[in-house]
């Protein structure tokens, strides 16, 4: 029996790739798309999709769920919309798979409570690329031995949040593995504000936004006479699709919220 999938954010680059992925998947059926703009009745009305993509488009979550009964909502929208989408989906008994970042700790706690009460799976993944998940795991392990760390994340210039969810998640994992410490000279002074990057538990996070980039991150570990660099590059958005498909299948087996793909693989 196919998993019934709805997608929010289908007109974005990631969302469009996800549409093609679900349409081609033999264990999934794309039953609806959520789009706040009235862009057409079906995906076939949009120039970016083939005429055979007759999947209906809805502007309201409630109408979408009532008409198409999806099992899973894949959200690839933006930080302004994702919290409301996730909360509404859970309250309508739809399992969210979220690839959008920008949640506050309070929002994550509330969503986790709802998912637990309803015994529904929910996956919030700052990054769907398997290689990026391995990078985070390796970084956590390295921090046990090399606690002086800086993170440089680089993304396309249309990304709204900084630092990226992947960088924040990496820093949180490193925080679990090392004792908090202040890095750099104790009397260092920024002659340009922000030059040393954002401070997270003593480690510095630097965000780069440039055209031509997709999603890239390096974690630098310094030690006496040595530098260890762990780096991951997503060269195109296909790198995320296997992770999305994996999460759609996995969320059907779950009864609570999981934050981070590294907690599943």
From Swiss-Prot:
> According to the UniProt entry, what is the EC number of this protein?
1.17.1.8
Underlying gene: dapB
Function of the molecule? Catalyzes the conversion of 4-hydroxy-tetrahydrodipicolinate (HTPA) to tetrahydrodipicolinate.
Give GO terms: molecular function aspect only.
4-hydroxy-tetrahydrodipicolinate reductase; NAD binding; NADP binding; oxidoreductase activity, acting on CH or CH2 groups, NAD or NADP as acceptor
Disulphide-bonded residues: none
Q: What catalytic activity does the UniProt entry give for this protein?
A: (S)-2,3,4,5-tetrahydrodipicolinate + NAD(+) + H2O = (2S,4S)-4-hydroxy-2,3,4,5-tetrahydrodipicolinate + NADH + H(+); (S)-2,3,4,5-tetrahydrodipicolinate + NADP(+) + H2O = (2S,4S)-4-hydroxy-2,3,4,5-tetrahydrodipicolinate + NADPH + H(+)
Q: What is its main location?
A: cytoplasm
Q: What is this protein called?
A: 4-hydroxy-tetrahydrodipicolinate reductase
Instruction: List the catalytic residues.
Output: 155, 159
Asked whether the UniProt record includes Nucleotide-binding among its keywords, one would answer no
Name the PROSITE patterns for this protein.
DAPB
Q: Which InterPro entries match?
A: DapB_C, DapB_N, DapB_N_CS, DHDPR_bac, NAD(P)-bd_dom_sf
């Amino acid at each position: 029996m196919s998993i019934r999938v709805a997608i929010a954010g289908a007109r974005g680059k990631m969302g469009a790739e996800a549409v093609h992925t679900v349409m081609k998947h033999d264990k999934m059926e794309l039953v609806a798309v959520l789009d706040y703009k009235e862009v057409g009745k079906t995906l076939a009305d949009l120039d970016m999709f083939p005429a055979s993509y007759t999947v209906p488009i809805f502007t309201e979550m409630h109408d979408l769920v009532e008409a198409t009964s999806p099992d899973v909502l894949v959200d690839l929208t933006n930080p302004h919309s994702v919290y409301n989408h996730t909360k509404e989906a859970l309250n309508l008994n739809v399992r969210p798979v979220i690839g959008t970042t920008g949640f506050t700790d309070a929002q994550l706690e509330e969503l986790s409570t709802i998912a637990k009460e309803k015994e529904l799976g929910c996956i919030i993944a700052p990054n769907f690329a398997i290689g990026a998940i391995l990078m985070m795991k390796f970084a956590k392990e390295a921090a046990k031995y090399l606690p002086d760390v800086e993170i440089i994340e680089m993304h396309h210039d249309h990304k709204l949040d900084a630092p990226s969810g992947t960088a924040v998640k990496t820093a949180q994992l490193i925080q679990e593995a090392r004792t908090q410490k202040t890095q750099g000279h104790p009397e260092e002074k920024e002659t340009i504000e922000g030059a040393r990057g954002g401070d997270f538990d003593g480690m510095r996070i630097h965000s780069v936004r440039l055209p031509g980039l997709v999603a890239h991150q390096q974690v630098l570990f310094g030690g006496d006479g040595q530098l260890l660099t762990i780096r991951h590059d997503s060269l195109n958005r296909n790198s995320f699709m296997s992770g999305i498909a994996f999460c759609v299948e996995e969320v059907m087996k779950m009864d609570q919220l999981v934050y981070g793909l590294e907690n599943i693989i």
